[in-house]
């Protein structure tokens, strides 16, 4: 039974065999061995599906798969302390008769001694009923949340895992196959454009690190007094994403010696794999499984060289004029009303190689566009930082073709070309602050650099990077905790966190010869976002935008509502021809992140109403495009069969759409929100009461400490924010460069 041994965490003991038996019984109820529905094998389903693969998929039991250990390891490694403790408690209770009685009630009672069965002894039918009841349990919501954690971890591992050959036994049945043409490496796949300036600390020792730093032109020596490696430079930039890459480029090109710290790793196109599990694990914060504290949100944030720009879905949308007006006039931040900012957007647009057309749209974007056209709704092209012919559905796992021009292939290349050095596998621990003798601008402290640590266990010494100017660009989730851990106390640090909350609608479009409407491709193929529709209010204000997502099999299964084992398998069997539309709102509400990995956020009522409007419009679009069935991801499996349905029935269905938040909410029905955009948690403000940084991007408390990432934005943007983040960083870093190279105060 050692194969089940998984180390404990947060002071709890190792996972026991009894707990693993509870987990196996739970997972069997989630994905039981069942007979496939006759229509799945009779030819009435999708044409492309292999019938033998379907039989094998339906007969597979969740308790018999090798992913049980991976599932509990995922909760252990990626879950919050609340999720981990709740999961362990539930598995422990289900391994006992008394605990099973407390959770399962009368389902576990039998007429023979000892009159109560453990969860693993219950029949499959009883276990399924227990899950169904608990997913509706609006009183003991912590129990429900724990059930959700286990379900999410298991399904994600089951559908995203790959063997060394890049295979998963479930993929053929659900119609998922990686397109070799779409995912072939570029002709320059061996190119390492950052090689000249990269130092990968994970491959170094303390001695070789010193040699590598010196080879890159840096002054690096052992500081025995502080047991550190001391590195001197003009500017240190913490983070290499949309903001950090731009800042590094601008500052290096102005003749300054720049060091960039990146805790993630560097990958070239040929090193990317077009698979969800490995891609999320190596390129995203917390392996792509980053929940809010209460579990109501799943958050995606890049954690590699290039940051979010290396893994985003290529959308390049300029800051809306209405947002610029609000920021410049209502919030009194002049920058956003200047020619300086408009020029910055053009510079960014050009350097990113943005194109405004798409030669061939993906399955999902075809459906979005067709549905909008049939309804007379607005639909627009979404510019991308790729070629017009770029047809890649796996850019979120790193662009294997090298066509997408993220920061790692643009701004950082420029920076390295002008002498910048990038340290990967290197995490900033705190800023080096001292009392400001000059008290310039009323700032009590002055920043002298960063204390950082390599994630390589062979490098025990801290890295002390001494710099004239320090730029924090770790993103809206990491900049606030870093500033707080350094001793900064501005009340805005970590607050005003905007997430662009997302809910999704789906529509099933079977690939049938008899169908009058045919959309080419599959849900996971082609350009991810090439079309957008705006949801407008009666006075033409934008309430939400509708786009299309990248959903690998694992993510799709996590978001899909579970109502029974058979239903779950039927939904997954339709994966490749299920189109998803995402509703994104410019959130008026906000949350906070003051400790790394601890995201607190509650959706504002106005934002929920706008999400509801977007969901309803998404469903109408899917129906108008010819979907056979549509629905939402609400926990009760809300859906509508479209064949022969009349307008009254459609309207009744749309009226039932709701946006309740999270499994811990006191409602029977609930949703899991998503977020791929995080902003505003160290926002610019006209004074220290309104913002964490001043109008030039400098900390109100510490001289020479600047912020150049999405946390600096005054509020949510309402559209994909990459261009806004880069343009803001361009303006701030240009001002820094001017100040440093002229010796004049800004």
From Swiss-Prot:
Protein name (record): Long-chain-alcohol oxidase FAO3
SUPFAM superfamilies given in the database record: FAD/NAD(P)-binding domain
A Pfam short name: GMC_oxred_C
InterPro entries: FAD-dep_OxRdtase_2_FAD-bd (IPR003953), FAD/NAD-bd_sf (IPR036188), GMC_OxRdtase_N (IPR000172), GMC_OxRtase_C (IPR007867), Long_Oxdase (IPR012400)
Catalytic activity annotation: a long-chain primary fatty alcohol + O2 = a long-chain fatty aldehyde + H2O2
EC nos: 1.1.3.20
Lineage: Eukaryota, Viridiplantae, Streptophyta, Embryophyta, Tracheophyta
TM stretches of this protein: 139-159
GO biological process, one term: alcohol metabolic process
PANTHER family (alphabetical): LONG-CHAIN-ALCOHOL OXIDASE, LONG-CHAIN-ALCOHOL OXIDASE FAO3
Top EC category: oxidoreductase
Disulfide bonds: none
Cellular location(s): Membrane
Keyword Nucleotidyltransferase tagged: no
Recorded family membership: Belongs to the GMC oxidoreductase family.
Location, primary (coarse class): membrane
Positions of the catalytic residues: 677
GO MF term set: flavin adenine dinucleotide binding; long-chain-alcohol oxidase activity
Residues involved in FAD binding: 233-248
Entry's Gene Ontology cellular component terms: intracellular membrane-bounded organelle; membrane
UniProt keyword annotations, A-Z: FAD, Flavoprotein, Membrane, Oxidoreductase, Transmembrane, Transmembrane helix
Task performed by this protein: Long-chain fatty alcohol oxidase involved in the omega-oxidation pathway of lipid degradation.
């Amino acid at each position: 039974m050692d194969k089940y041994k998984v180390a404990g965490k947060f002071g709890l003991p190792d996972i026991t065999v009894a707990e693993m038996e509870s987990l196996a019984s739970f997972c069997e109820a989630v994905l039981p061995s069942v007979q496939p529905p006759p229509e799945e094998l009779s030819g009435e389903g999708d044409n492309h599906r292999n019938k033998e693969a379907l039989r094998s998929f339906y007969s597979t039991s969740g308790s018999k798969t090798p992913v049980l250990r991976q599932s509990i390891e995922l909760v252990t490694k990626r879950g919050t302390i609340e999720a981990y403790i709740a999961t362990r408690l539930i598995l422990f209770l289900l391994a006992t008769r008394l605990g099973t009685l407390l959770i399962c009630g009368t389902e576990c009672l039998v007429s023979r001694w000892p009159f109560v069965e453990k969860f693993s002894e219950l029949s499959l039918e009883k276990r399924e009923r227990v899950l169904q009841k608990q997913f509706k349990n609006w009183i003991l919501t912590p129990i429900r949340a724990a059930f959700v954690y286990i379900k999410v971890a298991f399904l994600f591992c089951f559908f995203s895992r790959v063997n060394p050959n890049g295979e998963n036994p479930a993929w053929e049945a659900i119609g998922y196959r990686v397109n070799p043409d779409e995912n072939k490496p570029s002709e320059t796949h061996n190119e390492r454009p950052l090689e000249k300036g990269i130092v990968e600390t994970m491959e170094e020792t303390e001695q070789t690190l010193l040699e590598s730093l010196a080879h890159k032109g840096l002054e690096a020596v052992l500081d025995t007094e502080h047991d550190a490696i001391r590195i001197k430079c003009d500017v240190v930039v913490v983070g290499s994403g949309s903001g950090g890459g731009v800042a590094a480029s601008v500052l290096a090109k102005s003749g300054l010696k720049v060091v960039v710290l990146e805790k993630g790793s560097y990958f070239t196109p040929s090193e990317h794999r077009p698979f969800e599990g490995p891609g999320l694990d190596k390129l995203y914060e917390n392996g792509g499984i980053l929940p809010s504290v209460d579990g109501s949100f799943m958050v995606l944030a890049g954690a590699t060289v290039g940051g979010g720009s290396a893994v985003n879905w290529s959308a390049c949308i300029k800051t809306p004029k209405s947002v610029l007006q609000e920021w410049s006039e209502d919030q009194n931040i002049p920058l956003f009303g200047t020619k300086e900012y408009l020029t910055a957007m053009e510079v960014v647009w050009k350097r990113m190689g943005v194109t405004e057309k798409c030669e061939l749209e993906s399955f999902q974007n075809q459906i979005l566009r067709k549905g909008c056209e049939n309804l007379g709704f607005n639909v627009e092209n979404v510019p991308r930082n790729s070629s017009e012919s770029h047809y890649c559905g796996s850019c979120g796992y790193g662009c294997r073709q090298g066509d997408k021009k993220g920061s790692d292939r643009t701004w950082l290349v420029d920076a390295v070309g002008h002498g910048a050095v990038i340290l990967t596998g290197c995490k900033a621990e705190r800023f080096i602050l001292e009392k400001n003798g000059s008290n310039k601008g009323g700032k009590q402290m002055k920043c002298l650099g960063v204390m950082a640590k390599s994630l390589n266990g062979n490098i025990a010494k801290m890295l002390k990077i001494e710099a004239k100017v320090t730029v924090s660009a770790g993103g809206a989730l990491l900049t606030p905790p870093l500033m707080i851990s350094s001793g900064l106390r501005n009340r805005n640090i970590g607050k005003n966190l905007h997430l662009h909350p997302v809910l999704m609608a789906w529509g099933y479009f079977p690939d049938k010869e008899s169908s009058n409407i045919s959309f080419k491709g599959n849900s996971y193929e082609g350009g991810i976002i090439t079309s957008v529709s705006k949801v407008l209010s009666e006075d033409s204000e934008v309430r939400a935008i509708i786009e299309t997502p990248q959903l690998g099999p694992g993510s799709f299964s996590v978001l899909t509502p579970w109502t029974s084992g058979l239903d779950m398998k039927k939904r997954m069997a339709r994966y490749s021809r299920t189109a998803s539309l995402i509703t994104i709102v410019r959130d008026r509400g906000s949350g906070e992140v003051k400790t790394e990995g601890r995201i607190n956020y509650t959706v504002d009522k106005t934002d929920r109403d706008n999400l509801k409007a977007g969901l309803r419009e998404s469903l109408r679009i899917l129906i108008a495009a010819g979907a056979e069935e549509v629905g939402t991801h609400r926990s009760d499996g809300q859906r509508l069969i479209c064949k022969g349905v009349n307008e009254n029935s459609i309207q009744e269905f749309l009226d039932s759409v709701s946006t309740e938040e999270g499994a811990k909410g006191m409602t029977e029905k609930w949703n899991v929100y998503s977020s791929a955009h995080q902003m505003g948690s160290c926002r610019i403000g006209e004074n220290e009461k309104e913002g964490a940084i001043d109008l030039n991007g400098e900390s109100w408390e510490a001289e020479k400490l600047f912020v150049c990432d999405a946390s600096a934005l005054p509020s949510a943007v309402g559209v994909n924010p990459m261009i806004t983040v880069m343009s803001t960083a361009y303006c701030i870093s240009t001002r820094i460069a001017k100040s440093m190279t002229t010796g004049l105060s800004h």
